[in-house]
């Protein structure tokens, strides 16, 4: 195996050929599909009388359009029911494993892949979804792909891609109380910009990253795309291996763990690996970060003032003015006290069990503010069941939260869970674009799960560090 970064090693390991276009044809170890981006690709196969080449390397779920209040069939939304039925037919005819709502394993695609043990270090993973970068937390190269590429992978298990540069982002020190992985990635995007990663893959490293659990690493890799990067990853280590041991695949195939671990160790970036760029951030100086605008890069520390547009680079001034007008915020003020109408705990960024535990620690013994509708949407049916086994559902329900079924929910306006009018939401999701949560007048403030919980019970953006937290639920 070649020397260098994990990206170099895994790329070379999966190279089938170098194409005349300058792209590389890569073998894909795992192809994840869902109901939104796969139908057209299956249609293209049928037009050409082609079959799925490796159904055993393909796994399907339904997440974007599935309702979270009532998943009984047929769905109330005719379009959602049609997409679900088409996916069911496609996977049945192709012999593809499908985690459907009756399986007990359904959930957001980037939650179920890791929890089932399908996601493994040194893999190449693709999915017709921009947040496929989530799987990079395990030391995989994971890329979101378009419909024509989905077709190619279904037919050949390969994809044509251009190799990118690698930027190492070192987050040093120890994160302080109330500061989570979500704050780290929001700060990275704030500093480097939403286009700062264009042409790059991000390697996350440093003590603060190494100290994170796997769920925290997934949150960071998940939002690499919001920073403009093609993908993001963390080198696998003992934290990775211990987490993998508990997954379905390795519980059923324990011998494979010992067989694969030498490969996992070999693909770690070498200590003397050369990077195209290195950025260092002192994690000990970070505080909870929230967004004030309409892109994930328009963020600010909870105690810091919202920037004046004229103080920003010229190319960012007009978008900042428009964002501040839409959000109704004032330069020079902080986001503390910004009133919210909705609190949303969910999405492929922050809907895993540790996220829910931390939020429950804030919620326990408190009540959702009268002016707020609050919901918890677990990332998968397994997360939901595990949370219920710990009594987390009762903590949330007693506080006034709605406890929903698994799905993408209010992360995007593609299902029944949406903002209404100019409602403002405190959201643990990954995007705050205008209209993202269903209403063109809606306002989304991104933050970590604890901060969402704090906003839910106070009715406004609140520094969670000021609330006494119940750490044992």
Curated annotation (Swiss-Prot):
Record keywords = 4Fe-4S, Amino-acid biosynthesis, Branched-chain amino acid biosynthesis, Iron, Iron-sulfur, Leucine biosynthesis, Lyase, Metal-binding
Q: Does the keyword Plastid apply?
A: no
**Single GO MF annotation:** 4 iron, 4 sulfur cluster binding
Q: Which residues bind [4Fe-4S] cluster?
A: 348, 408, 411
Query: Pathway listed for it?
Result: Amino-acid biosynthesis; L-leucine biosynthesis; L-leucine from 3-methyl-2-oxobutanoate: step 2/4
Output the InterPro entries linked to this UniProt entry.
3-IsopropMal_deHydase_lsu (IPR004430), Acnase/IPM_dHydase_lsu_aba_1/3 (IPR015931), Acoase/IPM_deHydtase_lsu_aba (IPR001030), Aconitase_4Fe-4S_BS (IPR018136), Aconitase_4Fe-4S_dom (IPR036008), IPM_dehydratase_rel_enz (IPR050067), IPMI_cat (IPR033941)
The record describes how the cofactor is bound as: Binds 1 [4Fe-4S] cluster per subunit.
Q: Which GO terms describe its biological process?
A: L-leucine biosynthetic process
Describe the reaction catalysed, as an equation: (2R,3S)-3-isopropylmalate = (2S)-2-isopropylmalate
Co-factor requirement: [4Fe-4S] cluster
Pfam families recorded: Aconitase (PF00330)
The UniProt record lists the EC number as 4.2.1.33
Where do the segments described as Disordered lie?
A: 421-440
PANTHER family attached to this UniProt entry: 3-ISOPROPYLMALATE DEHYDRATASE (PTHR43822:SF9), HOMOACONITASE, MITOCHONDRIAL-RELATED (PTHR43822)
> According to its UniProt record, which protein family does this protein belong to?
Belongs to the aconitase/IPM isomerase family. LeuC type 1 subfamily.
Q: What does this protein do?
A: Catalyzes the isomerization between 2-isopropylmalate and 3-isopropylmalate, via the formation of 2-isopropylmaleate.
Q: Describe its partners and assembly state.
A: Heterodimer of LeuC and LeuD.
Specify the protein name: 3-isopropylmalate dehydratase large subunit
